[in-house]
Amino acid sequence: MEVLPRILLFDSGVGGLSIYHKIKKSLPKANYHYYADHMASPYGDKDDEWLDHRINRILIQLDQALTPDIIVLACNTASTLSLESLRSNITTDIVGVVPAIKTASEKYQAETIGLLATPATIEREYIENLTNKYSSNKTIIKVGSTELVALAEEKLHGGEIPDTSLHRIITPFIDANCKHVVLGCTHFPLLKPELQALAPNIHWIDSGEAIANRVQHRLGLSANSGSDKMKPQPETTGSNFYSSAEITDKLQTYIKGIGFTKVKSHYLPCI
């Protein structure tokens, strides 16, 4: 019998759904489990030591409970902070998500590139090393925002997104005539239609497709296949969404509409 892969995605909230959409397009038959740590969201303003401990404890428990074939750390802040420690604590293959600075620098000849991310990601040494390695000859305009994370969450919870707030956040890119901006938080592609409407001359770059390709490659699968090499998982087929806090009815409706059969709030592994 064909055994389909189980893919676990982890984020502080709904941002990782931007990655989920890309992976599901590549692997539509896979079983997906998504964990949103809404209780501690946003991650971008939390203490590093506290956050690293929390991420490791939750994912160790989820790995044991769900036995995924691969874990996608669908959060830039978590990836730049905890990817190394997670790989030392968990044997399951883990794919991280980092801002597409390398892609933007190599693909576009612009002298100026923007980076829109959370303050924690902006300030991370990992990002400094990334920009020094691939963009040393370019001007990098960095804008850190946790407000944009909240706006993306609000959108999927059914709220209105004020153009004035978005415009204020992206004004540094507009003023600098920046044509290419890397979206360095998985929440931000959820607002790409609004960003494009406000700044149509800016190319907003995210890493969703690259991550989907990497996951497919790591699993060794074609788009519509399973594999007899996957872990047997007869008891929990289907796709499930978990949140560490309460989520609105509108968000639950949205989540079920994109392929998740079960939604569970207040699910917090022992940490």
Where are these regions (language model features)?
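Non-catalytic structural scaffold of enzyme domains
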Residues: 1-271
